[in-house]
């Protein structure tokens, strides 16, 4: 006798086990009429839709496959990030243009080092732009997700066996990610990994680079100077001496018609960070005088970093970083003169000494009036740190000099502090030190609400520019 596909009507209502015969055993025992009139219930999986399949694929990016390997980030998702990087970030930290990156994506996607570089570049792009992207299946990806994916798979791209340009760039990109995520200690450690690898590869020596084709030379020079800038920024706040110096030539200017691919801004940033020299940053890192940090070298900083070259497009992505870095380094030079005992510099006479931070503050405020606020975030926490350093110098003027200087400095401090506290701060440590210093000087800051760190962390160092 054929069995029915579901329980009879009586057994279903009574919620008892049915043998699905007609009549069933339970109905016979209780003298019930056994019927099968109810419509069959739909059971089993729902129909598979194309959209559901795509969503499953995207979710599995961060899951292990049945064979034990790790699923790859889809090409289409990486491609979206590469386009964003080319449009908005290449001018700030140039590695490869979109055409070159797309060629890597299409031809070398299956090569381990190349693949992880592309994923880390995607993570850094989303982190710097503070945005997220959505796949075709509706799954959202962020810089935090992609960078965590890279870090959990570190053994995939770094086997501690030699060095190549893709490993170096991967660590550089990850260092940018963690700078934006308020994790500056990890960011600094990752930058140190990149610096170590670039030395192992010999990219700090002209003899090594000259043996390479021009395109590879150019890429090596870009990466080297990106790390040099990063290391010199960190030296001020980690108090660690630098290891990279201008032992190789910067990348050569490139003839391009697209301003997004111009190296002008990057080459100017290199100039801004190399005019002071390695000795300048080492003196700041060690809080002590360096015999090579002389009066002439400090004069050079003041003279050569006074203005931005005319060829840099005003109030562009590149201009913002150059402008704030100039003001920041000139302020650090002023502080270094006060720090080095016995150094008396003619152009920093007592009468003019008090005016220097005020002049720097005035220049910075003039820039902020014309720069769209959305341009600050892409440079990371470095902009807010550099502005805070200038405000800190004004507090020193208020503390140490005559009443006229104090009044002028206070007026600028009022405006600068409003600007500083309008920016995103990834770490509250430097801000806490600044506000404490102001309270000691009996200065009331123009704050409508108390400033809070974005993550509540209490690290001793801030993050990358």
Swiss-Prot record:
CDD domains: fungal_TF_MHR (cd12148), GAL4 (cd00067). It holds the Pfam family Zn_clus. GO terms for cellular component: nucleus. SMART domains: GAL4. The keyword Nucleus applies. Keywords: DNA-binding, Metal-binding, Nucleus, Transcription, Transcription regulation, Zinc. Residues 8-34 bind DNA. Induction: Expression is increased about 5-fold by ethanol. GO terms for molecular function: DNA-binding transcription activator activity, RNA polymerase II-specific; RNA polymerase II transcription regulatory region sequence-specific DNA binding; zinc ion binding. InterPro entries: Carb_Metab_Trans_Reg, Maltose_ferment_reg_DNA-bd, Zn2-C6_fun-type_DNA-bd_sf, Zn2Cys6_DnaBD. Disruption phenotype: Impairs growth on non-fermentable carbon sources. Results in sensitivity to a combination of low osmolarity and high temperature. Also results in the reduced expression of genes involved in non-fermentable carbon source utilization including MLS1, FBP1, ACO1, PCK1, ICL1, MDH2, SFC1, ADY2, GDH2, FUM1, CIT1 and CIT2, when cells were shifted from glucose to ethanol. Leads to reduced PCK1 and FBP1 enzymatic activities. Leads to defective mitochondrial morphology with unclear structures of the inner membrane cristae when grown in ethanol. Belongs to the MAL13 family. Transcription factor that regulates respiratory growth and plays a critical role in stress adaptation during non-fermentative growth. Binds to promoters of genes involved in non-fermentative metabolism, including processes such as gluconeogenesis (PCK1, FBP1 and MDH2), glyoxylate shunt (MLS1 and ICL1) and the tricarboxylic acid cycle (ACO1). Plays a role in maintaining mitochondrial morphology and function. Also plays a role in tolerance to pH and osmotic stress, especially during the oxidative metabolism. This is Respiratory transcription factor ZNF1.
